[in-house]
Amino acid sequence: MLKRIFARMLLGVFAFGIIALSWPTVALGDGCFSIVVGKDASVDGYVIMAHNEDDAPPQIVNHRKVSRMQHPPHETVELLAGGELDQVEVTWAYIWSEMPGMLFSDSYINEWGVCIASDACPSREDQPELTDGGISYMLRRLVAERAKTAREGVTLAVELVDRFGYDAFGRTYIICDPDEGWFFCAVGGKHWLSRRIPDNEVAVVANSFTVHEVDLSDQTNFLTSEDIVDYAISRSWYDPESGSPFDFAAVYADPEVASDSSNYCRQWSGLRHVAGDSVPLSESLPFSVVPKNKLDAAAVVKILRDDYEGTELYQTSPETGSPDKTGLNTICNWTTQTSFVAQLRRGMPLDIGIVYWMCLSPPCASFYIPFHFGISTFPTGFASSGEQPSDDFYKEKVEAPFRADPSEAFWTFSNFYHKIASDYGNKIASVRVEVDGIEQRAFALHKPVEEVALELYSVDKAAAADTLANYSNGIYLSTLEAMARILGAK
């Protein structure tokens, strides 16, 4: 197994040397990663959801808070390909991580604690059935606007895919609320499957379907399109006479993607952080595992920063000392544009219980900043352009001399990462010192700040929101100061 993986790594390094002659490079390392911690596997007692959004540059990420909205009768929603559906009377408030120009890269958390993100999981479907052009970009937005629970979100996704068909090559949507986590696997066209993550377990996905065994009689934990097995038989992807049980991932995933070590190695590395040595490195990995210890937000952050350090797969560039672009994708890599950990807690007002720990640029060399749902808006500078940048503009922004500019959050963090990545081996230690200090303070202040906000909330919600916003803004400004210190140090 390791010999085959290392052979691929060497091939990747050689390939990168060829394609690196022009800028930007081919997206070596391009691929998302997601985690769901079941409520009984978390320290909080509620679901934690996390995601690294990996897309090769040029990109920009905006963060916005969108208010609850009332809609007039007879209003319609138009889908990207031209399909239409009736608008609902009320759409819920949500936090929106937006990547302009990208159809499948946005993520959301709404006012009920329903969180949705996705991983590309290419399928072998090449004859998708679509109505009115199908649905793609708007699926996650509609879930955020309309669902009050994760199960409602899955049900809505099912209705949309059954009606329009899914207009993409395969994807896993991660849909969670404080009590449940689901993987909704859209194959393409009108075939899909969804599986619930066990409450006491942790599941990860890294760009390939992870649902294997399917219990069609268990509609509490599995939902599928009616002909999910029969369709596979009709396409000669599954033979029931073989004696082998129906394995969704084996049947529907693109075989090359499923056997790609850059995908299953990332899945394994995520699971090893959770379950330790009980999960051996293999192409065949469990859907979910029982953790050695219950996880909190800080433990999940550690997983999102993983680069195989401490394993035989860990490699670094001889030029920069970075684990990036060494031939095998890492969970945190140079294409990670934004990352988040969502604490989805009940037992208190959701304005306080929902916490969005977000990071701009690759988290292995960046900072997580907490934002409670109750904030009225993100700090100035967290949303700027509504368009995807050009190659030249992106290069100009990240290669310019570093300036800690609070009015341009994405460009400040991206520029910082560019400077660190060029001399990663010599600079990462000082980055980690600053990151640890700021994040430890953020976690230490978390509970006392929430206690103050809770006292205020029943009498003055605006004052409670200001308390939460001041906490977040203070952490944000401290990250800007830290980046300036790191790059100003001799």
Feature map (PLM): residue ranges:
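Positively charged n-region of N-terminal signal peptides that target proteins for export
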Residues: 1-8
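Bacterial N-terminal signal peptides
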Residues: 9-22
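A contiguous strand-loop segment
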Residues: 28-136, 156-288, 292
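Second-shell loop/turn segments in exported
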Residues: 128-129, 138-147
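Short, well-structured alpha-helical segments that form the helix of a local strand-helix-strand
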Residues: 153-162, 300-307
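Accessory, solvent-exposed terminal regions and/or long lumenal/extracellular loops of proteins
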Residues: 264-325, 329-334, 431, 438
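Substrate-recognition/cap regions that form aromatic- and gly/pro-loop-enriched pockets
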Residues: 317-447
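Histidine-centered catalytic/metal-binding microenvironments
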Residues: 421-490
